[in-house]
């Protein structure tokens, strides 16, 4: 199997800085599908949460660059995923330690998609999302939020994030890849004003056939949600399986 992929992260028109981070990397080895797409959304109520998002982005990129020469000749799929799990937990502890040592609150969500030959693997913390688009739009991550009542109104709060506690709790799942599927990893800035029917129609009409076209679809979606009034940072990774 092969894939086409695009990755974008923008500040948007209202926020003073971009607290999101996104990355997408893939193996250059012939006949090997090994790729990662990751989006981290810094918690807006914490003034310096881009530090946490940057830690995750850099950590995942370093992990991939370390594993790419080894897979599949010198490390199998199970060992590779175990190593990634351990790396994510170490990054979480790094953020938690930074908070304690510097006396500041930072944190971020993390939605990470790993493609390994004929399977996908999800590592997820927080309320960013990963959608799978085939003959419909399906969310394959769970929003880790809690609903509380304040001043007589229901309010949604983030229940889990990278750096919240020293010992990370993380959602994981796996599935089989099918040619024609599209994965969209994104921060809540991408999804809050994006209707499923519009997303489905865009994916079907555009029929991505290159990395450039994948990025063009992301640009289109980001432009659309900004026009719809989105004020948050917006980040996404789009991957089509062929």
Where are the language model's segments positioned?
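PP2C/PPM-type serine/threonine phosphatase catalytic domain
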Residues: 1-242
């Amino acid at each position: 199997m092969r894939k086409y992929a695009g990755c974008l992260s923008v500040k948007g028109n209202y926020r003073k800085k971009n607290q999101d981070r996104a990355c997408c990397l893939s193996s250059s080895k012939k006949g090997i599908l090994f790729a990662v797409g990751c989006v981290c959304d810094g918690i807006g109520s914490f003034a310096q949460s881009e530090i946490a998002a940057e830690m995750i982005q850099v950590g995942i990129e370093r992990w991939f660059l370390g594993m790419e020469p080894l897979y599949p000749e010198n490390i199998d799929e199970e060992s590779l995923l175990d190593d990634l799990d351990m790396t994510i937990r170490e990054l979480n502890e790094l953020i938690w330690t930074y908070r304690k040592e510097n006396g500041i609150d930072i944190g971020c969500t993390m939605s990470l998609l790993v493609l390994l030959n004929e399977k996908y693997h999800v590592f997820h913390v927080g309320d960013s999302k990963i959608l799978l688009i085939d003959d419909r739009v399906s969310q394959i991550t769970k929003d880790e939020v809690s609903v509380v009542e304040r001043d007589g109104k229901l309010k949604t709060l983030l229940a889990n994030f990278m750096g919240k506690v020293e010992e990370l709790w993380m959602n994981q799942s796996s599935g089989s890849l099918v040619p024609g599927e599209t994965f969209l990893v994104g921060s809540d800035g991408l999804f809050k004003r994006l209707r499923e029917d519009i997303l489905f129609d865009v994916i079907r009409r555009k029929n991505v056939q290159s990395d450039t076209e994948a990025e063009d679809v992301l640009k289109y979606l980001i432009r659309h949600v900004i026009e719809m009034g989105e004020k948050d940072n917006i980040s996404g990774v789009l991957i089509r399986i062929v």
